[in-house]
Amino acid sequence: MYGGDEYANNSEYYDDYAHTGDPQLDMEYERNYYAARMPDNVKYFLINFCQAIKEGNLYDIQNMYENTFPQISDHHFDKTAWPEEQEVAAIVDNDKVFLILYKELYYRHIHARISGGPKLEQRINSFFNYCDFFNLIISAQNPVMLELPDIWLWELVDEFVYQFQNFAQYRARLTDKSQDEIQQLCVNHSNEWSILCILNVLHSLVDISNIKKQLEAISQGSDPQTVAGDFGKLSFYKMLGYFSLVGLLRVHSLLGDYYQAIKVLEPIEIHKKSAYSHIPACQISTSYYVGFAYMMMRRYADAIRTFSDILLYIQRTKQLYSTRSYQNDQINKQAEQMYHLLAICLVLHPQCIDESIQQVLREKNYHDAMFKMQCGDLEVFKSFFVFACPRFVSPCPPAADAPMEDYVKDPMEHQLLVFMDEVRQQKDLPTTRSYLKLYTTLPLTKLASFIDPNASEDDVSKLLIRLLCFKHKMRNLVWSKGPSGLEGTFKSGSELDFYIDDDMIHIADTKVSHRYGDFFVRKILKFNDLNRKLKNINI
């Protein structure tokens, strides 16, 4: 109804109005003054946007949110901010709800488009605007009758967590701030964007929507409406609750609390499709953080399954988000990060994956890097991890008397240290595996001589430790069923198993042969479909 072309024409700014001292006349003058300064297409868009939100017209709201707003941003406000609140308030009759939603988009635009990022005052104002929005919907005695598209609700929660992350990095960077700015951050703004506020908001949205009870009811085959409550029955609250669970997953991952990150999703069956996973960006973000948490918990089989499933999903559904360039860029970047993480997991825990994913790994030359990692090149592990990991944050700001340094990288360096310590413990295992795969029985002394031609008796004792390490590292907790992603059974992920009797290693190859039939059936069906389409083309 309100496409971008309708707002294509611009008008010049001008200032012809003066105040009279009469409150009524001044209000009218102010409305006319700001309306005159604003381009006509922007003014009409804001008026129609406000009207659509008032009427709860989801189709128009989604069209204007997904299409018209980005188009006007590109045309008028590519490197500048949208009009200030008072300018917009004058033409929408001070509609409180609309102004809160408008400011959410206003500050989001500043974070995304303005060179140098938002100023401290803008960061603080954005925080208080989120507080106004969440207080409006959480503190109400009765549900607020507000209808917003699910994509906006997801991006609102996602942006809320992103701005927390961005502010945590901003306050940790002391080298570009004066002493007065640091004092202001530590004294005047110590509570804004605090981790307690973020967790409190997200948990409150989860609780008020009863989303956990609804998900449990769905998993048991019951009607979720019976446990939804007055608020949770509304799609607005229900979806906010669901997206808040994903927001909590992201927050705990950014803090390095991977156990809690997975635990907070317990009502969601991570490895199954859900009726709530219709927003591609939400599903992809969920899988990224779940897969990363699994990797850091040394549950490589679950991480590989999570990454493989979502990368296949991305391959098959690109057309769903390709029309929105900024979302396309974000998803492509996250997909690239997941390919890096998948490569790491496959080196540490080799196993078969889908042929189409293997094909991408080959085409993008991941195999060269994977070979280097298998040979113990720690720098490749490090570079892959740094590229693909989340941008970790500290829950606490630097102390007021801390040295003037850049503390942004401290959380990431700590997580890198933990990860590389695990890699160092495993870097010799591929060599051990390669020798064991060649034999069914192998004396300990012979294996020791393969590894080191000058091996002594002490080296044989160390070899026992290495073999025990191999056994230990190859046994992972693997999810099999149930709503909790933390549950599972211990399984050996190696392609071979062995036991030691006296000084002899007895080896059994447990590798499952490739099933090429499914691959060729898919290719034949695809070829037949292509052949039918070619025959239907009239030349």
From Swiss-Prot:
One of its GO terms (cellular component) is eukaryotic translation initiation factor 3 complex. It holds the Pfam family Paf67. It comes from the Eukaryota. InterPro entries: eIF3l, PCI_dom, TPR-like_helical_dom_sf. One of its GO terms (molecular function) is translation initiation factor activity. It is found in: Cytoplasm. PROSITE patterns: PCI (PS50250). SUPFAM superfamilies: TPR-like. Residues 306-514 form the PCI domain. GO terms for biological process: formation of cytoplasmic translation initiation complex. Keywords: Cytoplasm, Initiation factor, Protein biosynthesis. Component of the eukaryotic translation initiation factor 3 (eIF-3) complex. The eIF-3 complex interacts with pix. Component of the eukaryotic translation initiation factor 3 (eIF-3) complex, which is involved in protein synthesis of a specialized repertoire of mRNAs and, together with other initiation factors, stimulates binding of mRNA and methionyl-tRNAi to the 40S ribosome. The eIF-3 complex specifically targets and initiates translation of a subset of mRNAs involved in cell proliferation. Belongs to the eIF-3 subunit L family. This is Eukaryotic translation initiation factor 3 subunit L.
